[in-house]
Amino acid sequence: MAKHLFTSESVSEGHPDKIADQISDAVLDAIIEQDPKARVACETYVKTGMVMVGGEVTTSAWVDIEEITRETVREIGYVHSDMGFDADSCAVLNTIGKQSPDINQGVDKADPKDQGAGDQGIMFGYATNETPILMPAPITYSHLLVKKQAEVRKSGKLDFLRPDAKSQVTFQYDQGKIVGIDAVVLSTQHCDSVTTPDLREAVMEEIIKPVLPAEWINKDTNFFINPTGRFVIGGPMGDCGLTGRKIIVDTYGGAARHGGGAFSGKDPSKVDRSAAYAARYVAKNIVAAGMADRCEIQLSYAIGVADPTSIMVETFGTEKVAHEIIIEAVRQNFDLRPYGLQEMLNLLQPIYKQTAAYGHFGREEFPWEATDKAAILADFAGL
């Protein structure tokens, strides 16, 4: 593949699906802050004037679901009926039940180290050295654009913006290296009074130019800013939102494979989440160690069983040492049992709400982004 294009998209914290993700993770955080061993699977549905929170929770904690929901919506910025959604007046329905004891008997063990996986499934982790944070550039810059949109909206710099927004960036590659940006799409909800030309100019000057590196922009780069011309009706009034519907935005923007399991609202006993974080941690440390330029890890689990049923390492021909050495390094230096990866990544803490917008990976504040194993792996491989 000599020359090619690759595109990824992101959505803002005010996108309906992301509202749902953030509510689910806010509930999770509130519960595990009181009860770190709680079992939580929290799903959220949002539509005009309504939020429904459901799922299965087994815990000794008590949390105020309604207040958590309203505060989350308020922080995002839906605070007036003019936006089609209002934190203070929306209905909040709570339909949470308990997790099945059939699951508990497979997960909970006398020795915590023998804790079984909360479900079967496959999970992928990925890293590439095309950016300093070892993430693919298209998803990285798509996230940065909508994050900047929220920043200038909340600061009042562009006070005509509203919470809902989407971005999309197409990168040009030659021999696997970035040579430029081919296209940029940014659509943002706005108030009715701003004109389309004024909005487009403001978005270009205050969002796009400060975020995208100038050396990747050229005269042939295409910009599509609110291409329909009008985006007043947005958020839950424009579309209903559901937890777990932005799994590619949450991960690698399509640059790596995905096992299908969503993250938000799930406690760390759910390997859909915790093992995907661990797989990223492993892949990132392999690349940081210089063992490969690109790395994808696949893990699989059986419900109630501690050890992974399989571990796969793919380096796409970019490995600097024998493939067998990389695999052995993974087996000797990472505990990928559910209990082991929870301990390794310190997952039993209330850090999940902040993961629920702008991507779960490539953000240094999260423990699975540490490269503390890189030196150990490099030494193991003789690099």
Swiss-Prot record:
Annotated spans, Flexible loop: 99-109
Chain positions recorded as K(+) binding sites: 43
Binding residues for L-methionine: 56, 99, 239, 270
Top EC category: transferase
Co-factor note (free text): Binds 2 divalent ions per subunit.
Pfam families linked to this entry: S-AdoMet_synt_C, S-AdoMet_synt_M, S-AdoMet_synt_N
Keywords attached to this entry: ATP-binding, Cytoplasm, Magnesium, Metal-binding, Nucleotide-binding, One-carbon metabolism, Potassium, Transferase
Metabolic or biological pathway: Amino-acid biosynthesis; S-adenosyl-L-methionine biosynthesis; S-adenosyl-L-methionine from L-methionine: step 1/1
PROSITE patterns according to UniProt: ADOMET_SYNTHASE_1 (PS00376), ADOMET_SYNTHASE_2 (PS00377)
Domain of life where this protein originates: Bacteria
One Gene Ontology MF term: methionine adenosyltransferase activity
InterPro entries reported in the protein's UniProt record: ADOMET_SYNTHASE_CS, S-AdoMet_synt_C, S-AdoMet_synt_central, S-AdoMet_synt_N, S-AdoMet_synthetase, S-AdoMet_synthetase_sfam
EC number: 2.5.1.6
Cofactor list: Mg(2+); K(+)
Presence of keyword Nucleotide-binding: yes
Chain positions recorded as Mg(2+) binding sites: 17
UniProt subunit comment: Homotetramer; dimer of dimers.
Function description: Catalyzes the formation of S-adenosylmethionine (AdoMet) from methionine and ATP. The overall synthetic reaction is composed of two sequential steps, AdoMet formation and the subsequent tripolyphosphate hydrolysis which occurs prior to release of AdoMet from the enzyme.
Name recorded for this polypeptide: S-adenosylmethionine synthase
Organism: Vibrio atlanticus (strain LGP32) (Vibrio splendidus (strain Mel32))
